[in-house]
Amino acid sequence: MQLNSTEISDLIKQRIEQFEVVSESRNEGTIVAVSDGIIRIHGLADVMQGEMIELPGNRFAIALNLERDSVGAVVMGPYADLAEGVKVKTTGRILEVPVGRGLLGRVVNTLGEPIDGKGPIDNDGYSPIEVIAPGVIERQSVDQPVQTGYKAVDAMIPIGRGQRELIIGDRQTGKTAMAIDAIINQKNSGIKCVYVAIGQKASTIANVVRKLEEHGALANTIVVVATASEAAALQYLAPYSGCSMGEYFRDRGEDSLIVYDDLSKQAVAYRQISLLLKRPPGREAYPGDVFYLHSRLLERASRVNAIYVEKFTKGAVTGKTGSLTALPIIETQAGDVSAFVPTNVISITDGQIFLETDLFNSGLRPAVNPGISVSRVGGAAQTKIIKKLSGGIRTALAQYRELAAFSQFASDLDDATRAQLEHGVRVTELMKQKQYAPMSVAAQAVSIFSAEKGYLKSVELNKVGNFEAALLSFMNSEHAPLMKLINDTGDYSADIEAELKAGLDKFVATQTW
């Protein structure tokens, strides 16, 4: 075979003409240590706090410690195959998650990836998980209610749209049950819900999703999951991820509700990460910024004014306020609300619902302790009729608790004290409510009206529940227009009071309970 020098020359010229100069600039580093989901990287420059670092196999880590000669990052996912010498590179991006209406009815992980087997998500865009909370001028006062469907909560500890109300108690006291019932009660209210499960068993979360679906509330809800078996980084970031998904609706002039179940486990995950990053431990071995961990999250729950919404949507939505209501859950140990994380979250939130083990075990469910449960801003948002009628409920229960303790040592009681005890024990019985059975405003109003106006005096204690069920059935059939009026307006007038009284008198005369 003879080589033609002209052909070779032409071929070389052609290659030279077609040659393109491409320069790629990459900020690349090398892993120098791997341990328990934490990697230490040498050689990276210009890294941002919280920046995503790309690892081999389409995985990412988040830069948390920026030191003089190395970067400490936490791996989001499996890390067993990472070793010293592996090359990694910066992305120049902060972690973002998909947001939009396409996520409603779906179960996603911390990164917004679907894990329910229903195919890809049709999201409207992406939002950073760390967002600065709206400022003072951008906010509006809380004056619209979020109905949980629980008489004990809506009457004594009302929650408003844009409020942060802590649900606190020992394990197995009904904290998750209360939050799930609050979500179920929103299915026809227009409030979009986000349920964030942190560090829970996968079987427990599957049961929650099934219950939401059974009661028709899943279509209105986004479920964000970071199970107990997932990396600590994913458990730490899950609440921020869910919050961004809820803010999507708030910023567009809609109302949303988010449940963090629970922030104790998030704090434990963050403590684990911080100790592995060799940050100095403080009280209970938590890092120094554990307060900021929760405050920057819960401050994002707010009610924003119409100007903020109009500016955010560039004029597409006008005259509408938006809200994100938060129900964080904290698990206490042996009822100790003075521990580090519980006191932090109590000081950040606008009130707390304290659930007690003793009350739960005695059959009072929801096991709300009205003595130390409080809502600091919800009173302004309470429905008119419930606010008007429920004034005596908290007083009756407080007096009953005091007298019940006193009566154990007193041999004989006067008639007034005995009447107060009788009334208190019946109101306590009336506050009991089954799970997955949230009540409408009208049903709550009728129930509380019967207690306030003395209709329970003649009812035997063990028949209070039957009396209430029969009364509500009677009112819904015989006084349907009145019940609809109360549900629609929430007003309380002399005419409504007269009709309620007439209905109750008529029902009591039937003796059908």
Swiss-Prot record:
Record's Pfam families? ATP-synt_ab (PF00006), ATP-synt_ab_C (PF00306), ATP-synt_ab_N (PF02874)
In its UniProt entry, the species of origin is given as: Shewanella baltica (strain OS155 / ATCC BAA-1091)
Where is it mostly found? Answer: membrane
Locations listed in the record: Cell inner membrane
Instruction: Output the Gene Ontology terms for molecular function.
Output: ADP binding; ATP binding; proton-transporting ATP synthase activity, rotational mechanism
Family statement: Belongs to the ATPase alpha/beta chains family.
- Binding partners and assembly: F-type ATPases have 2 components, CF(1) - the catalytic core - and CF(0) - the membrane proton channel. CF(1) has five subunits: alpha(3), beta(3), gamma(1), delta(1), epsilon(1). CF(0) has three main subunits: a(1), b(2) and c(9-12). The alpha and beta chains form an alternating ring which encloses part of the gamma chain. CF(1) is attached to CF(0) by a central stalk formed by the gamma and epsilon chains, while a peripheral stalk is formed by the delta and b chains.
State the NCBIfam families in the record. Answer: atpA, PRK13343.1
Q: What is this protein called?
A: ATP synthase subunit alpha
Reaction it catalyzes: ATP + H2O + 4 H(+)(in) = ADP + phosphate + 5 H(+)(out)
Q: Which InterPro entries match?
A: ATP_synth_asu-like_sf (IPR023366), ATP_synth_asu_C (IPR000793), ATP_synth_asu_C_sf (IPR038376), ATP_synth_F1_a_nt-bd_dom (IPR033732), ATP_synth_F1_asu (IPR005294), ATPase_a/bsu_AS (IPR020003), ATPase_F1/V1/A1_a/bsu_N (IPR004100), ATPase_F1/V1/A1_a/bsu_N_sf (IPR036121)
Stated membrane topology is: Peripheral membrane protein
A Gene Ontology cellular component where this protein is annotated is: plasma membrane
Which key words are in the record?
Answer: ATP synthesis, ATP-binding, Cell inner membrane, Cell membrane, CF(1), Hydrogen ion transport, Ion transport, Membrane, Nucleotide-binding, Translocase, Transport
